[in-house]
């Protein structure tokens, strides 16, 4: 059904969206797999972008050409500068965004990226050859081959970390 991809990105949260877009924009034939195409870039716990720590990451992604900051700006409902009572080094912008339109905006951007395909399914296994990820097996039984696999599935591993074939819990 699928031809071989250069890159498969598993998970369409913020990291997966940025990774898939970056991969496709440099010319790699990329597949982004997510459990639900209607919850791309979902802000599960707190619909905010920014703050002291997350804000630094968003600014770094923005400097590297990512979309998180742009999509945030387009969907901001309220903006606030945090820590104004402290010195300027601690000031940090934070935007509260519309949780629904944020994901819709991300999906629209991704659907228009050349070399990028979106697929709704659950990855249940990795295809490993000589210690390298060379594809995935999905819940509906598809075996999709690629040159590399990027796992950005966040909390869906229940805190399990994979580094190569080594696992930590």
What are these regions (language model features)?
Residues 2-15:
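Beta1/beta-strand and adjacent pyrophosphate-binding region of the FAD-binding site
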Residues 3-5, 139-148:
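Core beta-strand elements of the Rossmann-like FAD/NAD(P) dinucleotide-binding domain
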Residues 6-8, 29-31, 116-117, 135, ...:
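Structural motif
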Residues 9, 20-23, 133:
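Conserved phosphate-binding elements of NTP-dependent enzyme cores
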Residues 12, 140, 153-154:
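Glycine-rich, N-terminal phosphate-binding loop of Rossmann-like dinucleotide-binding domains
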Residues 21-125, 129, 152-169:
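Conserved N-terminal/central alpha/beta ligand/cofactor-binding core
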Residues 127-142:
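Conserved beta-strand-loop-beta-strand element in the redox core of flavoprotein oxidoreductases
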